[in-house]
Amino acid sequence: MNKTEMVSSENALPGGHTPVLAMPFFHRVTGDRLDRPFPSSETIYLAMGCFWGAEKLFWNTGGVLQTAVGYMGGLTPNPTYREVYTGCTGHAETVRVTYDPNQVSTEAILTVFLENHDPTQGMRQSNDVGTQYRSAIWCTTTEQFMTATTVKGSYQANLLNAGYGAITTAISMANGCLLYTSPSPRD
């Protein structure tokens, strides 16, 4: 299988019957309970390469209430890290960003996203190659979707003026929840 082509449903790994991590559980670095409710918050899911580094970007973004890493956009139920790494699940490494829209705008969150990875690389980021490293945005509200589309268009114009190619970032509505990953790739 080509690492830069999405797996078909016929060739996707079968996956597991139960989630890799069951709730409740806590963020390994911050200690936050990951099923903690945040009234008046919004959540957006961002894929921009390796999720460990991407998640750290949002820890220091004002108005971000919580982050978590896992997988979205795939075919295989309850995949493990090793399964996702094969490219045979269809999932992307993803950061869940929960934020207070009264403190930080969706546009500001998306600016951090776009300015901290190369959204023109397709199924890779730098030396990390594979569908799991693709650039994607999964929105949870129609307003987020419209904002993401507008921000992507503006950013695309700037990239073209600077001599870069087309943005390959996929934007869609989240049609499922984040599949949490184990705290370590060895798990």
Predicted regions mapped to residue ranges:
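A short, hydrophobic C-terminal helix/tail in secreted or cell-surface proteins
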Residues: 183-187
